[in-house]
Amino acid sequence: MTTSRAGAAPVTVDRAAIEHRLITLRKAVVQLDSLGRLDGARLANDPGTGLAVERVLALLNDLAFAINRHVSAGVLGEAPPRTPAASFGAAERAGLIDAELAAALAPADGPHHVLVQLYLDAEPEEVAAVVSAARSGYREYVRQVTGWITASAPDRVV
């Protein structure tokens, strides 16, 4: 998809690649939903569940990072962000997501999957809150990115 900003040369954004990653993001959020209740007792008795949660959260982070890098580099004309946390700020500057979502998906304490790793060892009862925040954040991310793609359709100028 070719888009342009006022006064800027058109840039190319690979809409199909973004949409493909969004499909995987949606599936990963559904996988988190399917795990059900994630209380401390369950995580202590079933360590595999904690590992699965951490892996799905890492996948969500990686996919969003790839989308954010691609769109921000194309739209902003800057070097792509080097970290997932920085990529959410760049995605916000590119108009892909709003500032509130950018902040929610780049927690100050670290990425959701890293927080889960730490909490599994020390405070497993905190895992559910981290997963809930990530699940709602990535669900909203999919919604906003889908909206951006729709608004940036080939027949529309961004």
List each language-model region with its residue ranges.
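Solvent-exposed interaction patches of small proteins and small membrane subunits
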Residues: 1-158
